[in-house]
């Protein structure tokens, strides 16, 4: 069976000639592959022109089947999720192709760059700008949640600007760890450590609320330029997250509104039952009202972003599989400790 769809779906895309010859349409029939945009463990992303209209360009994620062997379910899940989601702030999967060696995902091209890079480049940046960014993310994630999808890996690197335009919208990308709620209980320790919710580290069953926590972490960074949780020792980092220990340090938070701080507290609440949903967050005065300050905070935020994120251990280490393994080990230890405490009572 094709990785990217049913035989019925594949047949719809095939022409009569293709059926007669017993082959599927090839990606080269429609697209001209151009520059390499990036590479990953199992894939590369190439720029491509549409043959019929060279003015139209797309991104093509080319996945090596041999490298992917044993992880096909993960790719199928990502494709199912992307096919379900149609939102102006979510990078769209346009179509898919497959041959003997590769799977090709034709993806909407976004050209505006990463979130933090754009903020650093700006001449002016305010709480209101941060509020507008977070509102767009909340609207997209609220839509995802209504569709029964949990992203599970929301972080700044997965937030891209659609275009270089000053008023460009923000786009959510990378659904490799996303999951549909109807596909079973979620309890796997996954995601990016600095942005992961306490219940994930505690290896408890979790749901949509993990995305809200991650948005809270992103909002925190957008207002000061550094992460709410950090330690060179990963076990200490995880302990901070489990307790929800973060501060609004002076002088970095002195000019930030109380409304912004309250918003972050509501999203980064350790108690899942008390943590805001996306809909509640969208109704908070910092998002929906005029509570966000218009004072320019660009100098302090951009200075901290450059110090804490550009080529930093934070950005590099949080892509590492080794750290994810540590998360799982830590979560397992937490379960054992809780079990022993329960038995001793």
Swiss-Prot record:
Gene Ontology biological-process annotations: molting cycle process
Tissue: Highly expressed in hepatopancreas and to a lesser extent in gills. Low expression in hemocytes, testis, ovary, heart, eyestalk, muscle and epidermis.
Region (Disordered): 1-23
Positions annotated to bind ATP: 37-45, 61
Short name of one Pfam family: Pkinase
InterPro entries to which the protein is assigned, alphabetical: Kinase-like_dom_sf (IPR011009), Prot_kinase_dom (IPR000719), Protein_kinase_ATP_BS (IPR017441), Ser/Thr_kinase_AS (IPR008271)
Catalytic reaction annotation: L-seryl-[protein] + ATP = O-phospho-L-seryl-[protein] + ADP + H(+); L-threonyl-[protein] + ATP = O-phospho-L-threonyl-[protein] + ADP + H(+)
Coiled coil: none
EC number: 2.7.11.17
Record family assignment: Belongs to the protein kinase superfamily. CAMK Ser/Thr protein kinase family. CaMK subfamily.
Protein name listed in UniProt: Calcium/calmodulin-dependent protein kinase type 1
């Amino acid at each position: 069976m094709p990785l990217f769809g049913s035989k019925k779906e594949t047949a719809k895309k095939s022409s009569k000639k293709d059926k007669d010859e017993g082959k599927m349409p090839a990606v080269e029939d429609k697209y001209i592959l151009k520059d390499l945009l990036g590479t990953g463990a199992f894939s590369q992303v190439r720029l491509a022109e549409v043959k019929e209209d060279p003015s139209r360009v797309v991104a093509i994620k080319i996945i090596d089947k041999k490298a992917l062997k044993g992880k096909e379910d993960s790719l199928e899940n990502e494709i199912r999720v992307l096919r379900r989601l149609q939102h102006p702030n979510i990078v769209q999967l346009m179509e898919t192709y497959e041959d003997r060696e590769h799977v090709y995902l034709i993806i909407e091209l976004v050209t505006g760059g990463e979130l933090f890079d754009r903020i650093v480049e700006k001449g002016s940046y305010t709480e209101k700008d941060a509020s507008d960014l977070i509102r767009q993310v909340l609207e997209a994630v609220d839509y995802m949640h209504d569709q029964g999808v949990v992203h599970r890996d929301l972080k700044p690197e997965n937030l891209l600007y659609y275009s270089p335009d000053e008023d460009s919208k923000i786009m959510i990308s990378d659904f490799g760890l996303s999951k549909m709620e109807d596909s079973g209980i979620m309890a796997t320790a996954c995601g990016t450590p600095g942005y992961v919710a306490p219940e994930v580290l505690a290896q408890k069953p979790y749901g949509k609320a993990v995305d809200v926590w991650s948005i809270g972490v992103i909002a925190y960074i957008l207002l000061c330029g550094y992460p709410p949780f950090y330690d060179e020792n990963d076990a200490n980092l995880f302990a901070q997250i489990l307790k929800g220990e973060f501060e609004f340090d002076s002088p970095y938070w002195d000019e930030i509104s109380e409304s912004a701080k309250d918003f972050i507290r509501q999203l980064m609440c350790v108690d899942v039952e008390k943590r805001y949903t996306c809909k509640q967050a969208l109704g908070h005065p910092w998002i929906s009202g005029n509570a966000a300050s218009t004072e320019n905070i660009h100098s302090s935020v951009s200075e901290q972003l450059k110090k804490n994120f550009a080529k930093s251990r934070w950005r590099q280490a949080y892509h590492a599989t080794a750290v994810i393994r540590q998360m799982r080990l830590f979560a397992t230890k937490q379960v054992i400790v809780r079990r022993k405490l329960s038995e001793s009572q």
